[in-house]
Swiss-Prot record:
Belongs to the G-protein coupled receptor T2R family. Residues 27-41, 115-127, 207-233, 287-315 are cytoplasmic. The chain crosses the membrane at residues 6-26, 42-62, 94-114, 128-148, 186-206, 234-254, 266-286. GO terms for cellular component: plasma membrane. This is Taste receptor type 2 member 3. It is found in: Membrane. The gene is TAS2R3. It is a multi-pass membrane protein. GO terms for molecular function: bitter taste receptor activity; G protein-coupled receptor activity. Several bitter taste receptors are expressed in a single taste receptor cell.
C-alpha cells in the first residue's frame, strides 16, 4: 500500500468518524427530546430521519472505499457491486430529497406571500409535508428501480473488460451504459430545482419584509428577518454542498472511464463523504435546540459549564 492509498484511507476514516459523530449527536438529542415529551416537530423528524439515513450512507461509502483499496475484484463482481449500488442510490436519493423537504418546510413556515396558492400550502403545511415525504419515498424507490438496469450493465461490461475480450458487442453495451448513466444523473435535477425555488422565494420574501420594516421605521433585526436570514443561510449552504457532492459523485461514477481509474475513484469517494457530515453540521448550527446542546457540551468538555446548568448560550 503506497502513500496515496494510505492518505485515502486516513481521509476516508476521518470523515467517516466525524460524519457518524455529527449524525449520532442529532439522533441522540432529538431522540431524547422525543422520549421526554412524546412529541416531535416535523422539522425535527426530517432532520432525525436524515441523520439516520446519512449514517447508513456513510457506512456504505466506507465499505465501498475499503473494497476499492483491498479487494477491487470483489468490488467489481456482479452481486456485491449491485448490492452497493442499489443501497447507495436509494439512501442517497432519499437523503437528498429529505434535505429538499426541509428547505420547503422552512420556506412555507417563514416566507410571507399573499398569493392564494402559497397561502393554501402555508395553512396546510403539516399535511402538505406529510404527503411530500410519502411522495419522495416513492420517488426514491422509483429512481432506484429505474437504475437497476444500469447496475447490471456495469457488472456485465466490467466482467468482459477483466477478460480483455473487447468485442463490438462490448462496445455497444458500454455505449448503452454511458447513455443510461447520463440519463440517471437527471434524477438529481428535481430536488435541485425545488431547493433553488425555496431559496429564491425566501430571498424575495426577505426583501419585501425588509422594505416594509424600513417604511414603518422599524429595526430590520426583528425575529422574522433573522428567521429569513437563518433559513436562507441553511438552504444556500446546502445548495453549494450538494453541488460539491454531485461533482464528487460524477468523479466517482465516471472514474471507470478515466485514464487513472483507481485514483479518480478514490478522489470521488473522499469528496462524497464530506456532504453527509458537512450538511448535518450546518443543520446543527441552524437549529436552536441542537446548537444550544452542542455549545453546552463543548463548554462542559472545556470545563466552563457544569453538566445540567444553564448558561448564556446566545448573545
Amino acid at each position: 500500500m503506497g502513500l496515496t492509498e494510505g492518505l485515502f484511507l486516513i481521509l476516508s476514516g476521518t470523515q467517516f468518524a466525524l460524519g457518524i459523530l455529527v449524525n449520532c449527536f442529532i439522533g441522540l438529542v432529538n431522540g431524547s427530546s422525543w422520549f421526554k415529551t412524546k412529541r416531535m416537530s416535523l422539522s425535527d423528524f426530517i432532520i432525525t430521519t436524515l441523520a439516520f439515513l446519512r449514517i447508513i450512507l456513510l457506512c456504505i461509502i466506507l465499505t465501498d472505499s475499503f473494497l476499492i483499496e483491498f479487494s477491487p475484484n470483489a468490488h467489481d463482481s456482479g452481486v456485491i457491486m449491485q448490492i452497493i449500488d442499489v443501497s447507495w442510490t436509494f439512501t442517497n436519493h432519499l437523503s437528498i430529497w429529505l434535505a429538499t423537504c426541509l428547505g420547503v418546510l422552512y420556506c412555507l413556515k417563514i416566507a410571507s406571500f399573499s398569493h392564494p396558492t402559497f397561502l393554501w400550502l402555508k395553512w396546510r403545511v403539516s399535511r402538505v409535508m406529510v404527503w411530500m415525504l410519502l411522495g419522495v419515498l416513492l420517488l426514491s424507490c422509483g429512481s432506484t428501480a429505474s437504475l437497476i438496469n444500469e447496475f447490471k450493465l456495469y457488472s456485465v461490461f466490467r466482467g468482459i473488460e477483466a477478460t480483455x475480450n473487447v468485442t463490438e458487442h462490448f462496445r455497444k453495451k458500454r455505449s448503452e451504459y454511458y447513455l443510461i448513466h447520463v440519463l440517471g444523473t437527471l434524477w438529481y435535477l428535481p430536488p435541485l430545482i425545488v431547493s433553488l425555488a425555496a431559496y429564491f422565494l425566501l430571498i424575495f420574501s426577505l426583501g419585501r419584509h425588509t422594505r416594509q420594516m424600513l417604511q414603518n421605521g422599524t429595526s430590520s433585526r426583528d425575529p422574522s428577518t433573522e428567521a429569513h436570514k437563518r433559513a436562507i443561510r441553511i438552504i444556500l449552504s446546502s445548495f453549494f454542498l450538494f453541488l460539491l457532492y454531485f461533482l464528487a459523485f460524477l468523479i466517482a461514477s465516471f472514474g471507470n472511464f478515466l485514464p487513472k481509474t483507481k485514483m479518480a475513484k478514490m478522489i470521488g469517494e473522499v469528496m462524497t463523504m464530506f456532504y453527509p457530515a458537512g450538511h448535518s453540521f450546518i443543520l446543527i448550527l441552524g437549529n436552536s435546540k441542537l446548537k444550544q446542546t452542542f455549545v453546552e457540551m463543548l463548554r462542559c468538555e472545556s470545563g466552563h459549564l457544569k453538566p445540567g446548568s444553564k448558561g448564556p448560550i446566545f448573545s
